[in-house]
Swiss-Prot record:
One of its GO terms (biological process) is reductive pentose-phosphate cycle. ATP binds at residues 12-20. It comes from Sinorhizobium medicae (strain WSM419) (Ensifer medicae). Pathway: Carbohydrate biosynthesis; Calvin cycle. The gene is cbbP. This is Phosphoribulokinase. Its EC number is 2.7.1.19.
């Protein structure tokens, strides 16, 4: 953690909806005139697409499911060094993983490859979005570097529905191919993804109120209006719950550290919660400058 150069980390699995949270933060940054450096977890994958396919096949022959959820498939040591360097001096480096043809045009690299590393500096804060923002293993501890840690954790069936629909629509995969990926990733999901949500400051969990019992045949993703949002705070004593309840219609507290909000109030809830927290980080930063 660094008072002078704060780091915000958004952690969530593939299909969890972390991009939605990133979009809300971008709105806040623009409205509040805050400059942020952005890094994506995909940029720290260890292998490009073709090499990853070869690695998966190689490990499968040994009876091992090798996935992007694992620490071994990612350059987490490099990511930690970026967090540490930004926390010390406000500088760092990142790159982009090119997912599809549209990004290939944008970045000038082939799909499934990485762009060159680029340095960033002169920002108010660093914003990370990806799979491992709070990862802790025997060799790395990313959580210790982050000043605000947020988990995005839909209930598992909803997460799978979102992933299946996204991968089919944007990446051309079949339901069977996405299902195979989900199955291969399950051990790493349990060992590497889930433990991070015990280290976050705030978790957002979308819960559908329609039947999602078989996510592999779901024709539609439940809409925000067909969901509720459970928001858990690690330090509830610092949260103004009466204010949130008054501003978020039909919300209520389910536990002393949790509030339940209608699903279509996600954007408003995040803005009400995050804006004062960001201001606190920047006030602390300015006192240190």
């Amino acid at each position: 953690m660094s008072a002078k150069y704060p780091i915000i980390s958004i952690t969530g699995s593939s299909g969890a909806g972390t991009t939605t949270v990133k979009d809300t933060f971008e709105k806040i940054f623009k409205r509040e005139n805050i400059s942020a450096s952005f890094i994506e977890g995909d940029a720290f994958h260890r292998y490009d697409r073709e090499t990853m396919r070869s690695k998966i096949a190689e490990e499968k022959a040994r009876g091992v499911d090798f996935t992007h959820f694992s620490a071994e498939a990612n350059e987490l040591e490099i990511l930690e060094s970026v967090f540490a360097e930004y926390g010390r001096r406000g500088v760092g480096r990142t790159r982009h993983y090119v997912h599809d043809d549209a990004e290939a045009v944008k970045f000038g690299s082939d799909p499934g490859t990485f762009t060159d590393w680029e340095e960033f500096r002169d920002s108010d804060l660093l914003f990370y979005e990806g799979l491992h923002g709070c990862a802790v293993t025997d060799t790395i501890n990313l959580a210790q570097h982050c000043d605000l840690k947020i988990g995005v954790v839909p209930v598992i069936n909803l997460e799978w529905i979102q992933k299946i629909h996204r991968d089919k629509a944007t990446r051309g995969y079949s339901t069977e191919a996405v299902t195979d990926t989900i199955l291969r990733r399950m051990p790493d999901y349990v060992h590497y993804i889930c433990p991070q949500f015990s280290l976050t400051d705030i978790n957002f969990q979308r819960v559908p109120i329609v039947d999602t019992s078989n996510p592999f045949i779901a024709r539609w993703i439940p809409t925000p209006a067909e969901s509720i949002l459970v928001i858990r705070f690690a330090k509830p004593q610092s949260i103004d719950f009466p204010y949130l309840l008054s501003m978020l219609h039909n919300s209520y507290m389910s536990r002393a550290n949790s509030i339940v909000v209608p699903g279509d109030k996600l954007d408003l809830a995040m803005q009400l919660i995050f804006t004062p927290l960001i201001h606190k980080l920047l006030e602390r930063k300015h006192r240190m400058s």
